[in-house]
């Protein structure tokens, strides 16, 4: 909270408020990149954290915080166990929403779109870059299923460490990457007295985006 108090001062919010108005990009990815780089270059505690909302085939929503691992004009990438709750829901209903909330900058980005699986090559590349402990844990975690005894998990990790001793850890087939391909991206900047600035980008055709300002 100390960092938030330093950065989210009224004076700073005013500067960011007018910066958004006068430096609006035609392409939402360019604006996201600008905002994201500013966050990465600041003492923000969790710059890559984003809320991921999914929905089951029965239209029951769920949400959780995951970490952004890659982004480009193709979309926003994260990795997970395909057998987890979110993995199953994205397989059944490949649509999702994301929310970035950077409280230090009094900014929020909302994203809605379709979801696709990354190919094995890209997923393998990222998996190989992970810490050894994280690779082993990925093998041993039956994500979202009931764990009756923590020692069972610890024991599975020890066995897997022996199995992969002095060898490269391969990626389990159930560990996958998803890419959220945006149809809508909304940027929100806090303003004084709740006079917030909101701009919504909607994909209309090909790579063309329609930009609309919304009431706060």
Curated annotation (Swiss-Prot):
Keywords of this entry: Flavoprotein, FMN, Oxidoreductase, Pyridoxine biosynthesis
Residue positions binding FMN: 64-69, 79-80, 85-86, 108, 143-144, 188, 198
Catalytic activity: pyridoxamine 5'-phosphate + O2 + H2O = pyridoxal 5'-phosphate + H2O2 + NH4(+); pyridoxine 5'-phosphate + O2 = pyridoxal 5'-phosphate + H2O2
InterPro entries, sorted: Pyridox_Oxase, Pyridox_Oxase_CS, Pyridox_Oxase_N, Pyridoxamine_oxidase_dimer_C, Split_barrel_FMN-bd
Record's keyword annotation contains Flavoprotein: yes
Signal peptide: none
Entry protein name: Pyridoxine/pyridoxamine 5'-phosphate oxidase
Gene that encodes the chain: pdxH
């Amino acid at each position: 909270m100390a960092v938030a108090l330093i950065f989210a001062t009224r004076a700073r919010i005013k500067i960011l408020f007018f910066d958004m108005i006068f430096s609006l990009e035609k392409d939402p990815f360019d604006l996201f990149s600008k905002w994201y780089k500013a966050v990465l270059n600041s003492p923000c505690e969790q710059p890559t954290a984003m809320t991921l909302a999914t929905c089951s085939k029965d239209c029951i929503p769920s949400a959780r915080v995951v970490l952004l691992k890659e982004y480009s004009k193709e979309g926003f990438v994260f990795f997970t166990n395909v057998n987890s709750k979110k993995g199953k829901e994205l397989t059944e209903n490949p649509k999702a929403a994301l929310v970035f909330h950077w409280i230090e900058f009094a900014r929020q980005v909302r994203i809605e779109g379709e979801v696709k699986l990354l190919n094995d090559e890209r997923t393998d590349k990222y998996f190989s870059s992970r810490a050894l402990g994280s690779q082993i844990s990925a093998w041993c975690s039956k994500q979202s299923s009931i764990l009756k005894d923590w020692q069972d998990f610890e024991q599975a990790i020890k066995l897997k460490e022996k199995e992969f001793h002095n060898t490269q850890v391969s990626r389990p087939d159930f560990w996958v990457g998803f890419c959220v391909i945006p149809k809508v991206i909304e940027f929100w900047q806090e303003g004084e007295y709740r006079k917030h600035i909101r701009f919504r980008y909607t994909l209309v055709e090909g790579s063309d985006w329609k930009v609309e300002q919304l009431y706060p």
